[in-house]
């Protein structure tokens, strides 16, 4: 199976240590988040935490299909991640805009 570009960019984030995993990990961050990525199968309480982080950091929130984020990161339990590198965040967003399975969250029901 061929790797997608988003999977490659997220892999770069992991290798560069420019990513935080999970709602609790994102909640502890103070600054420097440029993109939030969230799985649609995340629990409602964790999603509220991610929404608060989106407002706090004024960054876009990218929604993936259920259980896809864990597969992209090769960490099945991960349902949320924060990208802390501006250029990688822009690259992920540019690829996601051309792909119909990724959605930018803009508030309300998704």
Give the location of each predicted region.
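N-terminal first-folded block
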Residues: 5-38
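Structural motif
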Residues: 18, 34-35, 60-62, 79-81
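Conserved catalytic alpha/beta core of Sir2/sirtuin-type deacylases, generalized to analogous enzyme cores
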Residues: 1-8, 104
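Short, flexible, solvent-exposed loop/turn segments with mixed acidic/basic and small polar residues
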Residues: 26-28, 68-73
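N-terminal positively charged helical leader segments and presequences
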Residues: 30-60
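Conserved phosphate-binding/catalytic loops in two-lobed NTP-binding clefts
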Residues: 57-70
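Short, ordered loop/turn segments at secondary-structure junctions
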Residues: 24, 41, 65-68, 86
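C-terminal structural segments of small proteins and small subunits
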Residues: 70-110
């Amino acid at each position: 199976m061929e790797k997608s570009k988003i999977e490659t960019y997220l892999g770069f984030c992991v290798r560069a240590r420019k990513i935080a995993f999970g709602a609790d990990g994102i909640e502890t961050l103070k600054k420097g988040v440029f993109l939030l990525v969230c799985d649609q199968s995340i629990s409602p309480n964790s999603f509220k935490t991610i929404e608060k982080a989106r407002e706090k950091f004024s960054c876009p929130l990218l929604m993936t299909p259920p259980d896809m984020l864990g597969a992209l990161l090769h960490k099945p339990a991960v349902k949320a991640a924060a990208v802390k590198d501006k250029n990688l965040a822009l690259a992920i967003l540019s690829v996601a805009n051309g792909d119909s399975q990724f959605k930018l969250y803009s508030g309300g029901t998704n």
